[in-house]
From Swiss-Prot:
One of its GO terms (biological process) is translation. One of its GO terms (cellular component) is chloroplast. Belongs to the bacterial ribosomal protein bL33 family. Keywords: Chloroplast, Plastid, Ribonucleoprotein, Ribosomal protein. This is Large ribosomal subunit protein bL33c. GO terms for molecular function: structural constituent of ribosome. InterPro entries: Ribosomal_bL33, Ribosomal_bL33_CS, Ribosomal_bL33_sf, Ribosomal_zn-bd. The lineage of its organism: Eukaryota, Viridiplantae, Streptophyta, Embryophyta, Tracheophyta. Pfam families: Ribosomal_L33. PANTHER family: 50S RIBOSOMAL PROTEIN L33, CHLOROPLASTIC, LARGE RIBOSOMAL SUBUNIT PROTEIN BL33C. It is found in: Plastid, Chloroplast.
Length: 66
């Protein structure tokens, strides 16, 4: 039996450069990845370098709220 809340939670990572450069509107969308993280090991917000198909390069993807 599990105690309290689940340790692993599903999170969404969103491209930070697409969000900032939304004014230019060169891209047709915002890159998002769905992954899981362990709350005990990483209590803070997660940031990973992932490939953004709209920017055509590797950028920092930050965790967003659901």
């Amino acid at each position: 039996m599990a105690k309290g809340k689940d340790v692993r939670v599903t999170i969404i990572l969103e491209c930070t450069s697409c969000v900032r450069n939304d004014i230019k509107k060169e891209s047709s969308g915002i890159s998002r990845y769905i992954t899981q993280k362990n709350r005990h090991n990483t209590p803070s917000r997660l940031e990973l370098r992932k490939f953004c198909p709209y920017c055509y390069k590797h950028t920092i993807h930050g965790e967003i709220k659901k």
